[in-house]
Design a protein with these regions (language model features):
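Non-catalytic cap/lid and distal C-terminal segments of serine-dependent acyl enzymes
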Residues: 1-172
Length: 172
């Protein structure tokens, strides 16, 4: 298993003028990895992220399920509404329509039967959004809620089980 990380910037993994991190993954990162012999499709790629990256991993798996074998999201930054997202981060979505198009909860059915693992601490400000997502995830998804906040301590504690989850699904 190879681990490749990217920084999706501050645009919440959806297209903005001059920035499209999802296109960067599809058009640049995956082809580069394939040239190196890593993550050969179909479905030998897993996505994982923390906070905004966790949201991005889920969004990527929803938009490109044919590419993704499994997905893990640690404290995914999932807003429950466009006004909430706009108030907290005005640059996250260009419009209410962009939020609706990229709402991980609304589009969770696109995950199909894809193995999914999500984790969030009860003290995480994104817990309400992650909890809403957990209610609509595919059957068999692993949901890990417990004590913790949106911080490095919680993230670090969730990295080993998330990586093990992905490795287990890539090995099959």
């Amino acid at each position: 298993m190879a681990l490749v990380t990217v920084d999706g910037g501050a645009g919440y993994w959806n297209p903005h003028p001059g920035d499209d991190p999802m296109a960067m993954v599809i058009d640049e990162l995956i082809p580069r990895c394939q040239r190196l012999g890593l993550g050969r499709p179909p479905r030998r790629i897993a996505a994982m992220g923390i906070s905004m990256g966790g949201y991005g991993a889920l969004l990527f798996a929803e938009k490109y399920p044919h590419l993704i074998a499994a997905v893990a999201a640690i404290s995914p930054a999932i807003w429950t509404s466009y006004p909430q997202a706009r108030q907290a981060n005005p640059a996250a979505y260009a419009s209410a329509a962009a939020f609706a198009t990229n709402d991980a909860v609304t589009h969770a059915a696109a995950l199909g039967r894809r193995p999914v693992r999500v984790a969030s601490g009860y003290g995480d400000p994104f817990y309400p959004g992650v909890h809403a997502l957990a209610r609509v995830l595919p059957a068999g998804s692993v949901v890990d809620f417990g004590p913790g906040c949106h911080n490095d301590s919680f993230f670090a504690a969730q990295e080993p089980p998330s990586l093990a989850f992905l490795a287990g699904h890539l090995a099959t």
